[in-house]
Structures are given as C-alpha cells and as structure tokens.
Amino acid sequence: NMVLFLLEQGARVNLKDQENRTALSLAVFKDDPNLIKTLISFGANPNKLGPNRQTPLIIASREGKYNSAKALLEGGAYPDDTDLTGRTALDWAKAKRFKRIEDLLIENGAYN
C-alpha cells in the first residue's frame, strides 16, 4: 500500500498540513485501525495536538470512531488530554452519546 511504501522510504510521519492536521488525525476519519497502528509503529505521536488542540483520540471520540479510539488507546494515546475548550475525549463521547466509546475510555483509565 502507498502509505506503507512512503513510510518505508522515510516519510516524516508527524508532519502537519496547512490546517495543522497530522496523518494520524486524518486517518481517524477513515476509522481504519490498521492504518492507525501502522502510522504509530512508524513513530506517529498519538498525542500530537491538531486543530483546536484536539488529539487524534479527541477527534475519534467526537466523531464516534470506535475502532480508531481503540487503536489509539492501544498505541499510547492519553485519555485525559483536553482540547482548546477544556473537553476531554470522554467529555466529547458523553456529549455525543457514543456509549461504546465512553465505556472504552473509562476502561482505559479516563477520568470520569
């Protein structure tokens, strides 16, 4: 696959685009845990801040991307980071009523 090829050729995995997004934060929208795990295995930082100081885990929780949230937590994402508004991933999951993500975050140490 093209992503793996680019990573193997030394692509800088934590670069941000003009909108302050990393490859990992963009991968969250695809809800592809294999892509997320690949990026992390090549050094992608699962806690790197993006737009509005949102981590990939906060984005996954806000968007209801359970598979992404799970892969990020397995890859070392911090469950209690806050965004620009002071919300955590758990706050977003609760606000959007994504119960499976709420439970996942709590199981992985999110402060409730």
Spans of features found by a protein language model:
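Ankyrin repeat A-helix N-terminal signature
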Residues: 26-32, 59-65, 92-98
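Leucine-rich solenoid repeat scaffolds
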Residues: 80-112
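Ankyrin repeat structural motif
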Residues: 1-7, 32-40, 65-73, 99-106
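Eukaryotic tandem repeat interaction scaffolds
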Residues: 17-21, 25-35
